[in-house]
């Protein structure tokens, strides 16, 4: 019911898909047209397909947000914003069709999963996509798949690396020497957990320089900052005093790289109590640039060059975000 009402509220008329979730959706009475992939895939008659006339300002993607910090919203992304993020990812990662192979189990309804696929399509590199349920059922299969496909580029949230690092002793018969980029994004990065993954996979050929902790969000199509290829993972080890005082603690925060081309990041004065970090100007992270959304569906558009408040706290080391 919730999925149905969200689709209808943003103007969706047809849902293309397969599996149990589509079966459930088809049982909801209403005006949604359910189209099964098997009926519209290979062998189907597509002679009546009429391509749309689009330009850079045409809305290309409506991306739902999880609503973890408020009510769920729908991000409206233009074709130019999506394309900008894709080509800048290609540039930052140095993707090339004669060298690279991608592998992802991220769902295509998530910004990371979608942009991973689109970045691959932009360059024409082979990309293996498996259901996220396959990873959930057997997380260690991910490493086996990377081995079998000789993947060079993959991506996942922090929790996936955490699982493999925590149970790294179970890793067997894998070869990660082909992997030159492993992106960690979509959620805060646990330095200790990520290091355990790096330690567990090093004997199997994974090079620490391939690790790429990144920052992004649906409102910017996906990626905002990311290290250069080969830069690897680096941490800022600092003393943190909790808001309002308290016992200082030592923490390590992942350095999330420079902004992608066409994007800008700044830190503004916080309007709430924030942790105090010696020598660091902690504040609200704001972003703007070529990959930004037009706005939330149903709300006013972002102004040209307008800074967008992400709701996240952070600081800069030079031009790298933490």
Residue map of PLM features:
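Conserved AMP-binding/adenylate-forming
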Residues: 1, 104-107, 182, 189-320
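Structural core segment of the AMP-binding/adenylate-forming
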Residues: 1-45, 157-158
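Short beta-strand->loop structural element characteristic of the AMP-binding/adenylate-forming
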Residues: 1-14, 73-76, 126-134
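Adenylate-forming
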Residues: 19-24, 134, 151-199, 211-220, ...
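Conserved pre-ATP/AMP-binding loop-to-beta segment of ANL
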Residues: 45-64, 71, 81, 85, ...
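Conserved AMP-binding/adenylation subdomain of ANL enzymes
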Residues: 83-101, 111-152, 167-169
């Amino acid at each position: 019911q919730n999925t149905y009402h969200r689709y209808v509220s943003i103007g969706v008329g047809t849902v293309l898909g397969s599996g149990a979730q589509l079966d459930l959706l088809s049982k909801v009475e209403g005006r949604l047209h359910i189209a099964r992939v098997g009926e519209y895939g290979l062998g189907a008659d597509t002679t009546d397909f009429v391509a749309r006339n689009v330009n850079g300002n045409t809305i290309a993607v409506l991306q739902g947000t999880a609503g973890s910090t408020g009510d769920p919203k729908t991000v409206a992304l233009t074709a130019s914003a999506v394309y900008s993020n894709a080509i800048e990812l290609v540039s930052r990662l140095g993707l090339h069709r004669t060298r690279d192979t991608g592998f992802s189990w991220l769902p295509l309804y998530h910004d990371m999963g979608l942009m991973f696929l689109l970045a691959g399509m932009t360059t024409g590199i082979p990309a293996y996509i498996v259901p996220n349920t396959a990873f959930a059922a057997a997380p260690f299969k991910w490493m086996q798949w990377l081995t079998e496909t000789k993947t060079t580029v993959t991506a996942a949230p922090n929790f996936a690396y955490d699982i493999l690092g925590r149970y790294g002793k179970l890793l067997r018969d894998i070869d990660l020497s082909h992997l030159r980029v492993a992106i960690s994004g979509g959620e805060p990065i646990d330095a200790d957990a990520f290091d355990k993954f790096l330690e567990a996979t090093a004997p199997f050929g994974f090079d620490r320089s391939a690790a790429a902790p990144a920052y992004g969000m649906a409102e910017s199509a996906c990626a905002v900052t990311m290290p250069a290829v080969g830069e690897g993972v680096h941490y800022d080890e600092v003393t943190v005093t909790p808001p309002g005082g308290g016992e200082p603690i030592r923490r390590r925060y992942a350095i999330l790289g420079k902004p992608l081309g066409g994007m800008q990041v700044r830190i503004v004065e916080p309007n709430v109590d924030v942790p105090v970090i010696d020598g660091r100007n902690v504040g609200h992270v704001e972003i703007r640039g070529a990959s930004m959304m037009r706005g939330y569906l149903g709300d006013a558009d972002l102004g040209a060059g307008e800074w967008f408040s992400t709701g996240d706290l952070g600081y800069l080391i030079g031009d790298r975000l933490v």
